[in-house]
């Protein structure tokens, strides 16, 4: 049940031309990757330019802005120590400039090639949520990750009266399992 989500459109010419007619004028949700024919962007400014073209192109083709999930593309922190903040700055800029658009990412890319990835992933998830990220591709069976996400959502002001946090506590997601 629910609405289908198309993974994904980008500014890579062949992909854009193939996917746009599939989503144009529909109620489908679409992941919009900040990627172009020039390759992976490295800076926030590069991501914003791509996001702008993708979002405006989709909206112009009757895709509801609430159905657009921009993925600014997480790159491994082990290859360049600026990649974490470039991604986080991109999330903040996209959510500020394009009201109603969602942001999401494949979180574990940040820790690729590093030991004890779960700690990096959990901390990066919290940082990204604080900057406005509202969708994550994660392992939902990682109880500690789920607890971190629920807590971050609460601290970011997205959990009225801490209801989700309290529900997660009662369900044993946060705290000692029952």
Give, region by region, the residue ranges found by the protein language model.
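N-terminal active-site wall of soluble small-molecule enzyme domains
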Residues: 1
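Short, charged, surface-exposed secondary-structure boundary motifs
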Residues: 13-19, 40
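Catalytic alpha/beta core domains of metabolic enzymes, predominantly
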Residues: 25-174
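Catalytic beta/alpha-barrel core
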Residues: 4-13, 34, 82-83
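Metal-dependent catalytic core segments for phosphate chemistry
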Residues: 22
């Amino acid at each position: 049940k629910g609405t289908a989500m198309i993974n994904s459109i980008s500014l890579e010419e062949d992909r854009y031309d193939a996917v746009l007619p599939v989503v144009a004028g529909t109620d489908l949700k679409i992941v919009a990757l900040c990627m172009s024919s020039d390759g992976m962007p490295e800076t926030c400014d590069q991501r914003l330019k791509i996001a702008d073209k993708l979002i405006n192109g989709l909206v112009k083709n009757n895709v509801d802005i609430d159905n657009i999930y921009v993925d600014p593309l997480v790159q491994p922190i082990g290859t360049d120590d600026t990649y974490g903040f470039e991604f986080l700055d991109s999330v903040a800029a996209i959510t500020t400039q394009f009201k109603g658009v969602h942001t999401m990412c494949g979180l574990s890319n940040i820790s690729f090639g590093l030991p004890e990835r779960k700690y990096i992933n959990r901390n990066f998830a919290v940082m990204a949520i604080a900057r406005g990220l509202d969708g994550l591709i994660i392992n939902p069976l990682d109880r500690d990750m789920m607890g971190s996400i629920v807590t971050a959502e609460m601290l970011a002001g997205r959990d009225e009266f801490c209801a989700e946090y309290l529900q997660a506590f009662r369900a044993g997601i946060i705290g000692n399992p029952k």
